[in-house]
Amino acid sequence: MTVYRGEVRALDRLTLTIAAGEHVAMLGPNGCGKSTFIKTLTCECYPAIEPAPFTLRIMGKDRWSVADLRQALGIVSQDLIAECTRGLSSDFAEFPRRVTGRDTVLSGFFSSIGLSPHHEVTPEMAHKADAILERLEISHLAARPLNELSSGEARRLVIARALVHEPAALVLDEVGNSLDLRAAHQLREMTRTIAQAGTAVIIVTHNLSEIIPEIDRVILLRNGRVLDDGAKEQLLTSEALTRTFDLPIEVGRHNGYFHAW
């Protein structure tokens, strides 16, 4: 499929298949089309009919309601992270002190950030939210106001929010940007917990350190196209990443994680 952002081809005849249950990392430099790929999944960008017809199929279906899509995919986009780490959605700016970590997770049922008086939280919703907080070991954040949390703590709650519908796959778009070492480590460990529990994880990033050991497959993007696609060990190499980023890069590995310099 081809997707334009203004006059620019952000995705250029992209052809890609990700199997159900597969843990994948999509890696590439800024401007390579990663965020456009996410926005296409969330229907914020639409593929062009020309130069060729396209098919966008998710979980075997090419027609989706928004509600069904949310249950199939939990997507944590850069835009959502930015909205949450500012403190609150503007829709709920009048309730800054009331929005807690638990509210943030519960708001996933209503596609909001935080809860408003017209949102009716059922006992089943409350139970699911508490179970997710406990499973991800962030129950200690449940009662704390969102606007008093660190960026890393808020991001972990936003990821928990994406899991309330028990999606088959979780898509994470640059979720580790600008975190300190401790917060980045906590986020990686939580992502590993999710992957090990059976939810497929798709990590979209330009940073090798975000690629958890559970990832088996890497897709390298450049100029809106798939430059390479294959096993992690074959593509997270100095040669492949030098070609992808157009910059001399050396790659090392330690305790299942890759790093570059």
Where do the model's predicted regions map?
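H-loop/switch region of ABC-family ATPase nucleotide-binding domains
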Residues: 205-206
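Helix-to-loop junction immediately C-terminal to a conserved catalytic motif
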Residues: 42
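Conserved ABC ATPase signature
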Residues: 119, 145-149, 153
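Catalytic Walker B motif of ABC-type/P-loop ATPase nucleotide-binding domains
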Residues: 170-174
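ABC ATPase nucleotide-binding domains
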Residues: 242-261
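Conserved ABC ATPase "signature" region
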Residues: 106, 110, 121-141
